[in-house]
């Protein structure tokens, strides 16, 4: 009987993964935090899964090296070190107050943080999100006491003969006796209807501005403006197909016609005042300008963030255009040319130039500034 027990133990040892047969046996049953923002504005990452080589990569290391250095759609990878608890750890330098994205790489394969449900899609990948406080920007990302309501719904596009998804935010205390300004926010070529609320933090920005008395309560409308509307949760393939259909997006105005129908849907369904605004980032800025021209005198202001716009997008009414661009933005020259055309056309507009590039950290700042200006 004793020999039989020894045989069973030997067989179990043989089938254990090689990693577990070594000294480093990872006890993933104990409680741990995968990401911690420390008091000195450093961030510590922890990964306790199986693996020999683990790295963390994201857009936060660049900001720690140089407070004015920004990157366009690139991330830096840093190796994590296995410590006495059997888990892998890495800590950044002190970094700025911002919303950062990160992901793990385990044995050469990309892996999201399983303990962090705060995620967002960017290009064709899902990223985890960590928010760092500590400066004046913190107020943009703190959670106020009163929160509004997010509705996930759809509207019918007769031009395309299909339903398009849209997220609609109603402010805290939404009342049947009041009417509210409405702001339409359009994502870029690789986004979807959740981009502005997830990566853009549009709701937190608005609610904090309201709490600070810099903005009145507003309805936010964030539609899916992809060439082919997403079915279910975005995937690598669906977002990639949208990017590949970019040429069609630039020449097919069915999406803008669908947005015109969206305004009618919103006006008839919610308590909207006569104050209508629209803004978009990157190619969403082009769609915002086109939609404004399809609805002359409907929008009081148009926000163009890192815009991909041309002379045909010049305004056809008296709406004020707010153009924003970073000096390192890939479309910076385009924004400058469009601003000159606005000057020549004597159209009411403001141009704001910042450091940085084609990044969400800039678009969040642009949105905050735009919201404040349209409420003045």
Regions found by a protein language model. Name each.
Residues 174-180, 185-233:
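Short substrate-entry loop that stabilizes the transition state in hydrolases
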